[in-house]
Amino acid sequence: MQISEATAFLENAYVALNNKFFGGELPPVIITIQSSPRAYGHYTTWDAWHEGEEGYREINIGAETLDRPVPEIMGTLVHEMVHHYCAVNNIKDTSRNGTYHNSKGFKRVAEGTGAILVDYDPRIGYSPTRPTDALIAFIEEQGWTGVNLSRQSILGLPGGKGRGRSNGVRKYVCPNCHCSVRATKAVNIGCLDCGTVMELEEK
């Protein structure tokens, strides 16, 4: 996959996620893939790009982070889309020069999308996010789980970090009641209803 193809994939994902989780309300942005060593992604609060008289905000996805499972990358994209939503709707979502994410703005809007869950970090506030089951299911419906956006793929290099499962999503099933959950990493999990350890479903 060329970097232009990776960018095009993220642009198409932006449109699909906007329609699914934001009601199609978000204006277009420019998607970039650039080095971002200290962050998974970044959103510019001003019009960083111009075409004629039209200005566009930018969402950057860190090039170093593209070897993560697709649900985590999409979670990052949604995170930055929440910043975009807050900006265009005049919702104060951060403080401390944009580093601290607050609960009344960012957390409320982010979890209101139904796409990501928000955790708390005392240094940066309600910034850490993770994909919900709804987002993971949507990714599977779109057929995105097998997409490889890693630098090795973009540069045409062999191999990678070997995460073990190509789509990054694992399904755990209770052997008794057959209740299931999805996770983006290996976990030890049990069914409280049956008191049984849930088993990894092999694909």
Language-model features, listed with the residues they occupy:
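Conserved glycine-rich acetyl-CoA-binding loop
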Residues: P71
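Active-site recognition of the HExxH zinc-binding catalytic motif
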Residues: G75-V88
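Metalloprotease/metallohydrolase-associated module, dominated by Zn2+-dependent proteases
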Residues: I3-R68, I91-K203
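An amphipathic alpha-helix signature
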Residues: M74-G75, K107
